[in-house]
Amino acid sequence: MENQVKVGIGVMIKCNNKVLLGHRCKSRKDTGGIFEPDTWTFPGREQEFNETIFECAKREVKEETNLDIDNLEVFNASDDIQLNKHYVTIQIIANEYKGNLKVMEPNKEDEWKWFDLNDLPQNLYSPTRQFIDKYKNLK
């Protein structure tokens, strides 16, 4: 067991009343994060050494979706503890984006799709569900 807290970044990209979610592959192997295949998640992953949270958010979104994001704000932070893993997840909202949406890491997410905030899939990745629930409660 690894006794280390890691920092993860989750990015809600907003477009009107829609948010971008990626489908985590059913065959996805545990890549070090919290293991929940066949769920829908926001883009984002681990922060790297010497990288700000906004740099991480921009890098991860670009690596995963091919989108460039801007006008970022920190929304919340949460402790995500599962299966002997502990992540502090920084939840970031991106209010602007540009580029052509594309699946960049098909071994991790096999689809990216825009969902209305009031019509989300049931099988949300647990940290994503927490993020959305908190966001909707504050609106």
List PLM regions with ranges.
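Hydrophobic pocket-lining residues within nucleotide cofactor-binding pockets
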Residues: 47, 69, 78, 96-97, ...
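A short beta-turn/loop motif at secondary-structure boundaries
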Residues: 3, 80-84, 106-107
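N-terminal strand-loop-strand
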Residues: 1-41, 69
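NUDIX/MutT-family hydrolases
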Residues: 40, 93, 102-134
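Surface-exposed, flexible loop/turn segments at secondary-structure boundaries
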Residues: 19, 27, 80-82, 120
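The catalytic Nudix box helix
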Residues: 42-76, 92
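Active-site-adjacent beta-strand/loop module that shapes the phosphate/pyrophosphate-binding cleft
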Residues: 15, 78-101, 134-136
